[in-house]
């Protein structure tokens, strides 16, 4: 490997005729970063000597006519090699760009053996809440300028800004956390760990005012509650304060809700889709004095998360409403479990990267709700080891900061408590007084029946049921009871036979 400087990053983006083995370079963009600043950049078209397909033309804006007068790669290879040879090669999906450029340079007599950093991999670690990590989405989320997507130099400039953005975020982390990340970073693609290593070497020992350390984990301090602002009795004024447009049907719905709330009776009200019913019932409820607070239940966790992100955020920002989302314990990270897993050696690279993501997420979350982590579906085989079971041992290392316990405490004091039907019916079965002294609003109440049906259901293994029936028959003397047991046993065996027949039929059909 060449003697590459880890304080010199060479960010490269290539546009090519395809992403396959026969890909030919049609455009090169290079941005050089030294000591945290962009010091040089270079861009050029490359003549591929073959026509572009319509998809590539549309994607890049390049034409056959433009590339026909572009230089050969051999004419610019020396210039490109001088730029990239003694720095760390950086790209968004570095495998494609580095391998293709190395191949082109090799045929011109240059050997590219620089370390590689993948900004996709690094972004996945540092921004665990994101759902997607393509360059356009990252630039949009982080406010990075990307003037001409899929233009090599523009993409390289955006990737360089992204790298600087991520370095800045790393510098804001405590040195102890950087050390923990660095111990896991060998599992990142190629030499992506070098970015963390450089920041670690330059980072001071100063601690962050927003974080606190517990047994090597860095957790965000609880934010101070702001003094709530009083809502107007006028629905339209509240809508205006939220910077939303007034809608006649929504106003009519809100007035009806307000009238029903004043009557203090159990009431049902139907509203058509799309009129803005969430604000239509929340604002009238919040504008009324209520000692016990408001409990809102919605049909799904997806809708619960959506309301927290949209309506909940606006209400917090505008009126400083203390709103809390409450779910079952299995939705929260149990810090004791993660602590054990963190210190366990892993052979699975993705599992180790997920540990790094969680370490970053812990510095940002106040709830410990795992739904905040994007792409959580990719780690479903890992999650059961980490989730809370609703129990907290007195020997817990994190008893004072346990997310599930914190959620329960907040639920008691929050002005507006948001939950879902499944959790509500389960909670009421164990704690009937949960709704006492609260104004309860059931959104899409007709779907509460589904939650109640699911709660009432029990599951049995048919084989176990047959065994139990046979044991009962050995001792049962009553003739009617024996006939009932025999009938149940017959039906269970029939269902088992049908199941295996279907499996055999499916297998034969697949063959």
Predicted regions and their residues:
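Walker A/P-loop NTP-binding motif
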Residues: 279-291, 310-313
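Walker A/P-loop
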Residues: 263-281
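Acidic two-metal-ion nuclease catalytic site recognized across multiple nuclease folds
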Residues: 3, 165-235
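Conserved small/polar residues in nucleotide/adenosyl-binding loops
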Residues: 505-511
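A substrate-engagement module of RecA-like helicase motors
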Residues: 233-236, 292-293, 298-414
């Amino acid at each position: 490997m060449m003697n590459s400087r880890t304080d010199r990053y060479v960010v490269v983006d290539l546009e090519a005729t395809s992403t396959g083995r026969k890909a030919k370079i049609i455009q090169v963009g290079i941005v050089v970063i030294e000591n945290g600043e962009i010091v040089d950049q270079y861009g050029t078209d490359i003549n591929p000597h073959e026509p572009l397909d319509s998809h590539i033309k549309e994607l890049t804006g390049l034409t056959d006519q433009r590339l026909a007068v572009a230089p050969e790669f051999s004419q610019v290879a020396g210039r490109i090699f001088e730029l990239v040879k003694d720095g760390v090669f950086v790209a968004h999906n570095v495998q494609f760009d580095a391998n293709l450029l190395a191949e082109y340079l090799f045929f011109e007599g240059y050997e590219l053996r620089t370390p590689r950093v993948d900004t996709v991999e690094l972004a996945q670690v540092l921004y665990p809440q994101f759902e997607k990590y393509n360059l356009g989405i990252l630039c949009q989320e982080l406010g990075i300028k990307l003037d001409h997507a899929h233009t090599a130099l523009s993409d390289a400039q955006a990737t360089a800004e992204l790298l600087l953005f991520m370095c800045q975020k790393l510098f804001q982390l405590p040195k102890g956390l950087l050390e923990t990340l660095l111990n896991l970073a060998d599992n990142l693609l190629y030499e992506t760990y070098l970015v963390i290593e450089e920041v670690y070497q330059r980072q001071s020992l100063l601690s962050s005012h927003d974080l606190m350390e517990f047994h090597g984990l860095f957790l965000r301090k609880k934010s101070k509650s702001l003094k709530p602002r009083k809502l107007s009795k006028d629905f339209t004024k509240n809508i205006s304060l939220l910077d939303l447009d007034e809608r006649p049907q929504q106003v009519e719905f809100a007035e009806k809700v307000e009238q029903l709330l004043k009557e203090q009776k159990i009431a049902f009200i139907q509203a058509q889709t799309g009129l803005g019913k969430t604000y239509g019932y929340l604002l009238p409820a919040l504008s009324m004095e209520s000692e016990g607070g408001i409990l809102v239940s919605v049909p799904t966790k997806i809708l619960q998360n959506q309301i927290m992100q949209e309506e909940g955020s606006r209400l917090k920002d505008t009126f400083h409403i203390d709103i809390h989302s409450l779910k079952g314990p299995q939705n929260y990270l149990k810090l004791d479990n993660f602590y054990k897993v963190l210190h366990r050696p892993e052979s699975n690279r993705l599992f180790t990267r997920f540990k790094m993501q969680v370490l970053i997420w812990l510095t940002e979350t106040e709830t410990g709700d795992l739904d905040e982590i994007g792409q959580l579906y990719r780690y479903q085989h890992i999650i059961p080891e980490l989730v809370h079971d609703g129990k907290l041992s007195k020997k817990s290392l994190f008893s004072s900061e346990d997310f599930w316990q914190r959620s329960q405490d907040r639920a008691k004091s929050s002005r507006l408590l948001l939950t879902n039907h499944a959790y509500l019916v389960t909670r009421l079965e164990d704690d009937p007084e949960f709704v006492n002294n609260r104004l309860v609003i059931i959104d899409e109440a007709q779907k509460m029946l589904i939650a109640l049906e699911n709660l009432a259901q029990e599951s049995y293994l048919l084989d176990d049921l047959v065994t139990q029936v046979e044991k009962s028959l050995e001792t049962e003397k009553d003739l009617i009871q024996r006939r009932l047991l025999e009938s149940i046993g017959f039906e269970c065996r029939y269902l088992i036979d049908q199941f295996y027949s279907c499996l055999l039929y499916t297998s034969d059909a697949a063959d």
